[in-house]
Curated annotation (Swiss-Prot):
The record marks 201, 204-205 as: Involved in acyl-ACP binding. Changing residue 156 to F: No effect on substrate reduction. NCBIfam families: PRK07984.1 (NF005938). One of its GO terms (molecular function) is NADH binding. This is Enoyl-[acyl-carrier-protein] reductase [NADH] FabI. Catalyzes the reduction of a carbon-carbon double bond in an enoyl moiety that is covalently linked to an acyl carrier protein (ACP). Involved in the elongation cycle of fatty acid which are used in the lipid metabolism and in the biotin biosynthesis. Changing residue 203 to L: Triclosan resistance. It comes from Escherichia coli (strain K12). Changing residue 93 to V: Triclosan resistance. InterPro entries: Enoyl-ACP_Rdtase_NADH, NAD(P)-bd_dom_sf, SDR_fam.
């Protein structure tokens, strides 16, 4: 019996088998969780249904987090099969491509700023608000962040601001929902080659640098993140809330390791 046996968890953001969300879903399935999934549009529906079936689930629901009505409809549909459940994984982030290249001050626009914060940060609390009455005591909400929330990363630009907003969201949500027995955390994952990451200029160079200077001398995998996510959504982490847990091989704690390469 796995340490998530008896838990019902909704997973968003599965786009391919390279997705961090897929690694999370795999780990949660292995540990006995019953899973449900969302997809953004019809283009992704068949793919997500296939992945869900591989992980023992037939609950696959459409949800566009840019629309409150879509979020409400999704949870209404979920409530027909799960009147109560035990949390969700928010693995959603987006900024227009022209915002993720070059000088931040020159690249950022009012519209790009709004879109990045709406999709990448506000959607997390919007989902929590919509399903609050459905969450069992002991539930856990989890989102995915990145070091760009704390440091200026080349080409990450407005997404760094959106992730900083998301991390603040985690703290405020944890404080607000804690009395109901709901925990809220984030994982700040190291760079991983995913479809989303491919939109960041020079991402391969970032990966190579990270691998060379990270204390464990490798980049993390979706399995690494998945295992940590399963723990954070389980009762094993019952005392952890409002935290941003770095799953990056120690990259975020090191300085000047590049000197060893010269």
């Amino acid at each position: 019996m796995g340490f998530l046996s008896g838990k019902r968890i909704l997973v968003t953001g599965v786009a391919s088998k390279l997705s961090i969300a897929y690694g999370i879903a795999q780990a949660m399935h292995r540990e006995g969780a019953e899973l449900a999934f969302t997809y953004q549009n019809d283009k992704l529906k068949g793919r997500v249904e296939e992945f869900a079936a591989q992980l023992g689930s037939d609950i696959v629901l459409q949800c566009d987090v840019a629309e409150d009505a879509s979020i409400d409809t999704m949870f209404a549909e979920l409530g027909k099969v799960w009147p109560k459940f035990d949390g969700f994984v928010h693995s959603i982030g987006f900024a227009p491509g022209d915002q993720l290249d070059g000088d931040y001050v020159n690249a950022v626009t009012r519209e790009g700023f709004k879109i990045a914060h709406d999709i990448s940060s506000y959607s997390f609390v919007a989902m929590a608000k919509a399903c609050r009455s459905m969450l069992n005591p002991g539930s856990a909400l989890l989102t995915l962040s990145y070091l760009g929330a704390e440091r200026a990363i080349p080409n990450y630009n407005v997404m760094g601001l959106a992730k900083a907003s998301l991390e603040a969201n985690v703290r405020y949500m944890a404080n607000a929902m804690g009395p109901e027995g709901v925990r809220v955390n984030a994982i700040s994952a190291g760079p991983i080659r995913t479809l989303a990451a491919s939109g960041i200029k020079d991402f391969r160079k970032m990966l190579a640098h990270c691998e060379a200077v990270t204390p464990i001398r490798r980049t993390v995998t979706i399995e690494d993140v998945g295992n940590s996510a399963a723990f954070l959504c389980s009762d094993l982490s019952a005392g952890i809330s409002g935290e941003v847990v770095h799953v990056d091989g120690g990259f975020s704690i090191a300085a000047m390791n590049e000197l060893e390469l010269k």
